A protein has these predicted regions:
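Long, contiguous binding/interaction regions
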Residues: 1-10, 14-49, 55-159
């Protein structure tokens, strides 16, 4: 059972796409000692807005405080908490090519991924799944001695 005082939370923030907005949001977290586990930012197509997805840890009370503080920032238009969201995370993993090439391909397919590049000595796979399943993929991938694993931040969308 997760510790509700330090539970993983995802907050999605819709902001005006202008300079210094990201700095103001990260400063809000830093000034209060809140940790950001993952941060992704992307413009919203056909608008002057951006979508910021922040993964952090904390209690329900702490998340309420963060949400209230975010609402006070002028370029923030909407704040959505993780219960209302579908989350995905992406991973790129590089493996040495060996006799287990098929196993690596099957493993990545089991986690909504596949082979994205094959070189003479290396294979690169991409996996995109829920954060818990990404953690399991990374654990399972260790048996194939990955040379490198790069995790992207969480992206989320309201249900």
């Amino acid at each position: 059972m997760p510790n509700i005082l330090n539970e993983r939370r995802v907050i999605s923030v819709i902001v005006l796409n202008e300079s210094s907005v990201l700095s103001r949001i990260t400063s809000l977290f830093a000034a209060r000692g809140y940790n950001i586990e993952s941060l992704t930012v992307a413009p919203i197509p056909n608008s002057d807005m951006s979508h910021i997805t922040i993964a952090t840890n904390g209690s329900t009370k702490l998340m309420e405080q963060i949400t209230k503080q975010l609402h006070k920032l002028i370029p923030v238009y909407k704040v959505i908490e993780h219960e209302e969201m579908v989350e995905k995370e992406m991973v790129l993993a590089k493996f040495p090519i060996a006799e287990n090439l098929a196993d690596i391909s099957v493993l990545s397919a089991a986690y909504n991924g596949g082979v994205v590049n094959v070189g003479e000595e290396m294979i690169i796979v991409m996996v995109a799944d829920e954060p818990k399943r990404i953690k399991h993929f990374i654990e399972a991938a260790q048996r194939y001695n990955p040379c490198e694993i790069v995790c992207g931040g969480v992206v989320a969308i309201e249900r």
